[in-house]
Structures are given as structure tokens and as C-alpha cells.
């Protein structure tokens, strides 16, 4: 067991995959753990009702299901190439400005603008994070088979990253 762990640290594919999934889950955990609170908090958030929050979560889930199938089909064609991962990373990097300058104003506008904002937000948030999670995990699993390291050990870094960032953000906010 000790030799397997020692050899994992010498495997550059393990290190890259572990670091990539760690950073992805860190970036997801910093905002997703507070998304519900942001939607419902009347003082520092949008002050939505539980029903409105549920609608947003439902539409996000539907968009995630559709985008996951699209990502899966595209990634099956790409094999182990990271082009789709780079695209998802770019979308994920744009989530902060999108929420600040597009999503929040549309959600607070009400009416048809709010509904369009919910739809647009479900596509962006799902494309960048919620559906992207499955792709990052699938790529890591493919790399683990191809380059000889334990997927579970690499995936654990993602869970660790999410937990650490959510804990730190909880203390800060």
C-alpha cells in the first residue's frame, strides 16, 4: 500500500488529474454552498420565497440533465483530449461576472425578464459547474485507467477541496 501511494505521487497524470479536480471542486464549493442562502436572504441576497428557489433549482436540474448528455456525447468523440474540459473551465471562470452583471439583475427584475434570467442562468451554471462535475469525474476516471492510478484516490481530492473551501467560506461569511 505504501509503495502504491508513493508511486502515485510520482505519476504526473495522477498529480494533474488530482490537482484539476481539486481546483474544480474548490471553485464550485466557494459559491454553491451559499447559493440557496443568496437566493432567499432578504438582507444580503435576493429575498426569494422557497417556491421561487425551488423553481430555480428545478430548472437548473433539468438543464444539467440535458447538458450532461451533450457533454457525454462530445467527450466520447474526443477520448482523453481535454478540449471540452478547457471549454468548461472557461465557462466556470465566467460564472462570477455573469452572476454579478447578468443573472442577479435579471432575477431581481421580475416578470418575463426574471424567467429569461432563470433559463439563461440554468444554462450557464449547469454548463460551467453542475454538468461539468460529471465530465471532470469521467475524464479523471479515464485518465486513471490509461495512466495507472487509483480513481478514488484522485477523486477524493475533489471532495477534500469542496469541504475545505466551504468550511473557510463559512467562517468568512
What do the predicted segments below correspond to?
Residues 36, 71, 165-173:
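Small-residue (Gly/Pro/Ala) motifs that create kinks and tight helix-helix packing interfaces
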Residues 16-17, 108-110, 114-122:
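Short hydrophobic/alpha-helical segments at membrane-entry points of transmembrane helices
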Residues 61-69, 162-163, 167:
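Residue-level signature of mid-helix packing/kink "hotspots" within the transmembrane helices
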Residues 3-65:
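Helix-loop boundary and gating motifs at the non-cytosolic
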Residues 66-80, 173:
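Helix-to-loop junctions at the C-terminal end of transmembrane segments
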Residues 76-90:
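Cytoplasmic membrane-interface "Motif A"-like loop-to-helix N-cap segments
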Residues 90-111:
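C-terminal ends and interior cores of transmembrane alpha-helices
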Residues 121-157:
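Cytoplasmic helix-loop-helix junction between adjacent transmembrane helices
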